[in-house]
Amino acid sequence: GKQLFKQINCTGCHKSELTTGYSPISPLSFKTFSPYTDLLLHDMGAGLDDGYTEGSAKTFEWKTPALWGIGLSENSQGGNYFLMHDGRARSIEEAIIMHGGEAINSKNAFQNLSETDKNALLKFIKSL
């Protein structure tokens, strides 16, 4: 699953590792962690355009959410997923399929995977 995550370029936005910069609090300086995000705004396409702007973000731009802990969110939300910026996706697979804009190639690559590979990728994402 992890290799498929890289292969279809989910890592283009969902970076596996980030490193903190300098902090006067020494234990926080230059620490590497794995949030699976780049914390940046990305064009997610017309399908996720909700007509609202926030700060400098256009109506179709969304900050990449961290994927760490996503597998736990189903259990913490009464057995349901509420994914994407407005909770409209009810499964990880549905959230992937809603990707557009900058992520359209990753979405298409996901849809072209075999069922076995899709399941392996989804299992990996749930393990984060």
Tell where the protein language model's regions lie, with residue ranges.
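Electron-transfer interface patches adjacent to heme c in soluble/periplasmic c-type cytochromes
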Residues: 2-128
